[in-house]
Amino acid sequence: MPKIEGQIMELTTETIRFIEENARADVRSLALQAKKYPQVDMAMAVVQIAGRQIAEAKVPTWYHTEGLLYPKHLSMEQCSSEATAIYKASLVEGDTFADLTGGFGIDCSFMSRKFRQADYVERQAELCELAKHNFPLLGLDIDVHHEDGVEYLKQMNPVDVLFLDPARRDGHGGKTVAISDCEPDVSALEDLLVEKAQKVLVKLSPMLDLSLALKDLKHVCEVHIVSTDNECKELLLILQKMPVQSEISIHCINSLGATNGYRIYQEYTFTQEQERTSDCPLTHEVEAYLYEPNASILKAGAYRSLTQAYPVKKLHPSSHLYVSPHYIEDFPGRKFQVEAVSGFGKKDLKTFLQGMEKANLTIRNFPSSVADLRKRLKLKEGGEDYLFATTLADESKVLIKCKKASSLL
């Protein structure tokens, strides 16, 4: 059995049975019942049950692998999902690979399959022991090193690909906007990183200021902004020593789940030069279809170039909503059919909202919060109607009623 923080982790038959029988139970409730089950290591059981519950949705491949052990709650919450790990694996290949910030090992487990030799480096002893236990069960032959990633980097032999997932070091969970707020500090290590690997893949928080990151780092050749079901999850930077093209390609990815075992992605790629130089047609006419770019595109700031890639017009420079007279099936974001448009006069709203008790409300460039506007409109959350409160190119404020376009076709 692996050693965890100096103690032998022994899962007795009773504890294993308890974990299996309580797979769906509320772990907070179970933790209070330890005295009722003296033969069960309740502390360990609760950790394993909670880990499995998170893994079922987040990392199904791991969930369906028997015998895996899970770490404490924080490590599970912070680890990558299977969808984002699979995407990262699609960006790398070669002979040798090293993960300098191993963590729970999910990213390493998916990327390592693309290499002959893989090394996992982690300074927390517990996570190293879990990796030693779990990797063989996943059919992986990965060398585990209980060591600080920066120290390992200094003495390691060069590899084809290096991976880092710097952690926030603000100590209180506050908003992080700069690479220097993370540990290890990639900006301080950049020259050494590109000396040690042909390609360096860096995973950063989506809260990071992308423009600032590109100013801080001189070897970035690609940016990948990854969302899952329209929630921005990761900012990935690919660094290479030579050559670095003058224009960095920015890839906006939105994972929409899997069909028949194949993962479905929305993808939109552009450069900052394309964004700067693109004409952006504006309109104050709300046409038949309305589009909201996915979270990755909004994070990337690809507002103008979208109008060149797709036959759409923007409702306002700051609204980030687009319209077209005809349906554009492959637009990378949410797509709606417009049913009605209203101003905010009392009579207009009364007619517009007649018979409507609930709706999904979104604010875009509008002087109110969702909560305040929902209260004003006296609408509950949910239903099949979608309302967008926004500002048009002529500065008029409107409420746009829509239905999801995909459900109508």
Predicted regions and their residues:
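SAM-dependent transferase fold signal centered on methyltransferase-like domains
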Residues: M1-L409
